[in-house]
Structure formats: structure tokens, C-alpha cells
Amino acid sequence: MKTFNIAVIAGDGIGKEVVPEGIRVLAKAGERFGFQFDWHAFDWSCETYVKTGKMMPDDGIQQLRPFDAIFLGAVGHPSVADHVSLWGLLIPIRRHFRQYVNLRPVRLFEGIETPLKNWKPGEIDFCVVRENNEGEYSNIGGRLYEGTEDEIAVQQTVFTRRGVNRVLKFAFDLARTRKKHVTSATKSNGIIHTMPFWDELFHEIGKNYSDVRTDQYHIDILTAHFVRHPDWFDVVVGSNLFGDILSDLGPAVVGSIGIAPSANLNPEREFPSMFEPVHGSAPDIAGRGIANPIGQIWSGAMMLRHLGVPDAADAVERAIAETLAHAKARTPDIGGSSTTAELGAAIAERVRQK
């Protein structure tokens, strides 16, 4: 029987509550489709930082390197500054393992009430492809004259031809498997060096995909179109910052960030990829057992697809859709009163059923 070795980082807050439900559902998928998991837990979190001064050990990257994938819950706590937790754990993993694509699907499910009027399940279905290793999230910069009236803060944006081309190529290849339409997020009217460079490369790459329709919008009007015309989109590609913003807006448009998954991908599979829900650690509800586990479970389905078991991935995604459409189990964020474990169990049972 095929065994997948998975590193598990539950992290902080509700991450510790939703990760077990993801594992429960994936284990059921393995039982049904003839594979199994060897889960290895890493207790790295903001609590670790408070105790040790580090989000993960100095050799943390080396510890993760042998695994087939990384299954992450959520990272963040009010006791630790957000930039410390992000740059101490997630960004090093993404960069050392060349996870240069952050893929976030957006889909309106039956049984989920969208804040937008007159949209039906199936009418909103697109993906955001975010550049995940460079761009605006650079650590080049610094601060001078701190604490004085002359204080200066500088942070440099870094776009490389190689980095932009590879994420654009991924977006176009993905579009070929979907509705053959790629939209680029830009702001080249105001950001006059990096964004025109992005636009030029977008058009260059697009010439190699004559079967794929293309368009581009400035980020400000693009956010408006996400709300007014979400059916316009198939694959939306953006820089690190723009992709981050759009991939949070997308799930909000379809009803709940709690159901949204993401994959940090090394498409060449030279290094492990990492799968995590879009939502944060939600310390305001942590410990109450009411967090929505669907984002974690759907991220698990994305992991299954990446690991080469698409039938199992399809079964998990169907179980999510059927549970949302027909089951009574639903957490408070989507209009119910079920616990995290009850919703996870309902999805796992549907995966088990053939």
C-alpha cells in the first residue's frame, strides 16, 4: 500500500482544531482508495516563539525536507507580532522549498449563502494564482532615524524575469485545464517600473497560448469586478501582494473565508509543497470548537491531487459539496450550530460511502 509521509504543523488557535478534522477526512479517503499516511507532528507556533524566541528550530527546513508534503493549520497570536510569525515560519518554508505558486480556488457551493444577490451555485468558479516568493513581500529595506520626526521606512519590491515568467506560465497551463481564460492583476498606471515589467511578461507569455483568452485590470477596478461580476473570471494571476488581497476577497464573495483552501506549490516537485486554509488562527473563537474545518479539509483535497491521487481528491471535494448542500451539520459561520468535529465527521462519512 502506498504511504505518504506528511509533516503536520497545526500551529496556533483554531489550527489545532481544524487540522485533526482534515486528517480524519484524508484518512477515510486513504481507506477507500487504497493508500495511507504517516503523519509527523511538529509543534511549531507562536507559543514556541514565546518559549524559545524562534518560530521553528534552526534546522527546521532540514527537518521538513524529506516529507512528501506539509499540512499546516494556522499561524498567529496576539502575543507575537504578525510579521514575526509570518517571517519566522511560513515565508522561510515557501522560499526555501521554492513554493512560488500560491493557488486558491474560489467556488460558490449549494447551501452557502453569498452576500451577493442573485448568484447560484456553479456560477462563480475561479482560481487565484498568486506569486509566492518575491514581489512586494521582500525583506530588502530598513528604517532610519527611528523614533524621531525624520524617521524613514523603506521596503523594496523585487520582480525577476524568472520569477514572474514561471508563475505566469503556471497560470496559463492551469487555464488550459479549465475555461481557457487568464486575467492579470496590475497597477502599471501608478507603479511605473515593476508593474509595466509584469505586464510586458504577461503579454510575452500569452503569445505562446493562442488558445487562451487574456485580459488585465488595475487592481482597484479588479476588486470591484470581483464583487459585481465574479462570473467573468477563470484564472486570475497576480503579484504577491495583489494575489494575497484578491484571494481573501474571493472567498468572502462566495460566503465564508472558513471554507477557502490554498496550496503553496513547488510545481517541479523538487521540494515538498504546503497546504493550508486561507483563514487565520482566529484567537477570538479558538478553544470553543466552532471553527469551520472545510478550508482545512479542502486544502487536504488539493494535497491529494498534488500527491497523484485525483480520484481521492474528487471524492473529498464531492463530500464537501454534498455535506454543504444536504447535511444538517454546519458551523456558525455558515448558519448552523454544529461543532468543528461534527462537521468534520459528516464530511468523513460521505467520503467513506461509495
Give, region by region, the residue ranges found by the protein language model.
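Short acidic loop-to-helix transition motifs that present clustered carboxylates
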Residues: G111, Y217-A224
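Flexible, glycine/charged-enriched surface loops at secondary-structure junctions
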Residues: G34-H40, R178-T186, Y209-Y217, V309-E317, ...
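Glycine-rich phosphate/nucleotide-binding loop
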Residues: T48-Y49, F226-T331
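N-terminal glycine-rich phosphate/adenylate-binding segment common to multiple enzyme folds
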Residues: V50-V154, L241
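Buried hydrophobic positions in well-ordered alpha/beta secondary-structure cores of metabolic enzymes
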Residues: D12-G15, D68, V129, A171, ...
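Buried hydrophobic packing segments
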Residues: G22, L26, F202, Q296-L304, ...
